[in-house]
Amino acid sequence: MITTQSISDIRAQVKAWRQKGETVAFVPTMGNLHLGHITLVKEAKTRADHVVASIFVNPMQFGQNEDLDAYPRTLAEDQAALTAAGAELLFTPTPEIIYPKGMDAQTYVEVPSISDLLCGASRPGHFRGVATVVCKLFNIVQPDIAVFGQKDFQQLLVIRTMVDDLSMPIEIVGVDTIREASGLAMSSRNGYLSAEQKDQASQIKRSLDKMAESLKAGLAFKDIITQAQTELAEAGFRNDYLEIRNANNFAIADAGDVKLVILVAAYMGSTRLIDNQVVTLNA
């Protein structure tokens, strides 16, 4: 696998592949890779002739009191994992390469409405940072396909909307959440949890499963949410949000909706965890 910080190197290699009529899939990451990321790379490998990955801890999507400096950097381990998974080209730019004028002078991309809800309300400016860097990476790599995890459901929706609104010729693929044996969604931030906290955090998946069954049984949304909030609090969580929304348009769920998504964000200690579950009801 070739690793480079050079935009021109990335473009030259992708151009060479394209001249041979070959396709390119792209997996953007922030590094500190786990099995969830590797699953994305393997999925990308099944969908295109070549896989490009990136590792960039994007300062634009971190808030003032968030963990940018503490975010783990594990490049050597990540390179080995990406090579084993089948990636052929790795882009590892610095902030100065991505934002040569500095972030304050950077043209940005903002997806209205959905960027201000849920994680966007808790983390103002977060999705502007995500959309801007993903748009820039797409322009650098120019992939046919880009692969993302569905654990970040709102992020995936923001990216799909951006691609559609800006008429980008890129297929966006969402991959099911990969979980630890306990049911806890794999996340780089799980490394901040103690063994006891990890055990407590597995309550998220149990509550999501219970909520899904209650939705299928026709129970009232408000009652379902209240019960789950109680369960999570008893497990040691501090609630950020727990909502049921229409999975297609992200509106607050209505009784007539068929495809729903349950979205949760909660703190275990100082670590913020997110998860979701899509539920399809009988029409």
Swiss-Prot record:
Beta-alanine binds at residue 61. The keyword Membrane does not apply. SUPFAM superfamilies: Nucleotidylyl transferase (SSF52374). The active site is at residue 37. The reaction proceeds by a bi uni uni bi ping pong mechanism. It comes from the Bacteria. GO terms for cellular component: cytosol. One of its GO terms (biological process) is pantothenate biosynthetic process. GO terms for molecular function: ATP binding; pantoate-beta-alanine ligase activity. Pathway: Cofactor biosynthesis; (R)-pantothenate biosynthesis; (R)-pantothenate from (R)-pantoate and beta-alanine: step 1/1. ATP binds at residues 30-37, 149-152, 178, 186-189. It is found in: Cytoplasm. HAMAP family: PanC (MF_00158). Gene3D superfamilies: HUPs (3.40.50.620), Pantoate-beta-alanine ligase, C-terminal domain (3.30.1300.10). It is an enzyme of class 6 (ligase). It catalyses: (R)-pantoate + beta-alanine + ATP = (R)-pantothenate + AMP + diphosphate + H(+). This is Pantothenate synthetase. (R)-pantoate binds at residues 61, 155. Its EC number is 6.3.2.1. It comes from Shewanella halifaxensis (strain HAW-EB4). The lineage of its organism: Bacteria, Pseudomonadati, Pseudomonadota, Gammaproteobacteria, Alteromonadales. Keywords: ATP-binding, Cytoplasm, Ligase, Nucleotide-binding, Pantothenate biosynthesis. Homodimer. The keyword Ligase applies. PANTHER family: CYTIDYLATE KINASE/PANTOATE-BETA-ALANINE LIGASE (PTHR21299), PANTOATE--BETA-ALANINE LIGASE (PTHR21299:SF1). Coiled coil: none annotated. Belongs to the pantothenate synthetase family. Catalyzes the condensation of pantoate with beta-alanine in an ATP-dependent reaction via a pantoyl-adenylate intermediate.
